[in-house]
A protein has these predicted regions:
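Signature of N-terminal electron-transfer/Fe-S-associated modules in redox systems
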Residues: 1-202
Length: 202
């Protein structure tokens, strides 16, 4: 179970938007009627995506009612998985990988930029309330270190200049282009592929 701060300020109610309600129905239909509780992760993902990256208690009750399961069962899922947030993190949620490969390639400088421009401490909203940051463990993109995740997108091969540019763009309420800051194609070498040169689109 992860340690999470539950927001003291909670909305009185929650319900899916029309499009997310349709998506929720599609997820639920993937399972037999007596197993629709299996859709809980997918529905919580939709909640968080709709609600600026966090899940209010009213939404937990809403999902429990949709799936016809006890409130505590959904609450257990939300508090177990670190990708679910129980307090506001802003429209743009920055997760900085500080595991060994990223640290060796400059993640500390990325953290310093977040401290300077977003908030002094982790899990605190920026002055304009649209952005927050946190250090996380490996995000599985070690070959593109250092990197960070913003909402659902990866920003890779970062340096101080590019990181600062990205953060400033977020604070202006704009989402910058995701991917490699060095325009690498996936995990290919920076100067292009060095093997399988005779194979097209290898």
């Amino acid at each position: 179970m992860s340690i999470k701060k539950i927001s003291e300020i909670q909305p009185e109610s929650f319900e899916f938007s029309k499009s997310n309600s349709h998506e929720a129905e599609k997820e639920i239909k993937k399972y037999p009627k007596d197993r629709k509780a299996s859709a809980v992760m997918a529905l919580l993902y939709l909640v968080q995506k709709q609600n600026d990256n966090w899940i209010p208690l009213a939404a937990i009750k809403y999902v429990a009612n949709l799936l016809c399961i006890p409130y505590i069962q959904v609450y257990e899922v939300v508090t177990f998985y670190t990708m679910f947030n129980l307090s506001p993190v802003g429209k743009y949620f920055v997760q900085v990988c500080t595991t060994t490969p990223c640290m060796l390639r400059g993640a500390k400088k990325i953290v310093d930029i977040c401290k300077k421009n977003i908030s002094k401490n982790q899990n605190e909203l920026s002055e304009n309330k649209i952005c927050s940051w946190v250090e996380v463990e490996c995000l599985g993109a070690c070959v593109n270190a250092p990197m960070m995740q913003i909402n659902q997108d990866y920003f890779e091969d970062l340096d101080e200049s590019k990181t600062n540019e990205i953060i400033q763009t977020l604070l202006k309420d704009k989402l910058p282009k995701a991917g490699s800051a060095k325009n690498r194609k996936n995990t290919a070498p920076e100067k292009g592929k060095t093997t399988l040169l005779e194979v097209k689109n290898a």
